[in-house]
C-alpha cells in the first residue's frame, strides 16, 4: 500500500488508521523479531497470524458499516483520517492545512462545500483544540463529534470510530 501525501508534498504519518497497512507492519515486525530471536520464531509467527486475522475481521466490519453511509464525504479538523477515507471509498476534507488553522478563504470554501453536500458534522480529535471546529459546525448548522485515533485498544477503537462515523454520516 502506498503512503498518502499531503498537498504540500509531506507524507501522511497517520498510517496506523488503516488496518490493511497495519497488516504490513505486523508482518514486518514478526519477520524481524523472528530473525533477531529465532528461538521464539513460532511464537512471533502465531501472534502475528492471530492479529492479522483480527485485522481482517475489523477491516470487513468497517467496510460493511461504511458502505451504507448516506454521504461519502466528511470534514475533519485535523487531516488524520485520510487512510480511512482511502481504504473505504470516502473523501476526507480537512480544515487544518499543513498543521495550521484554516485561513478565512479555506474556511469559506469548506463552509460552501458543507452546505452544497449537506455535510452536518465535523470530526475532531480529542488531542486538538476544538474551538475552530465548533465555530465551523455552528456556521454550517451542524455539530462536532470527537474521535480518538490514539486510544489504547486499537481494534476496539477502530470499531468505535467506524460506528461513530457511520452514525454521523
Identify the function of each model-found stretch:
Residues 1-169:
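Extracytoplasmic metal-acquisition and chelation regions
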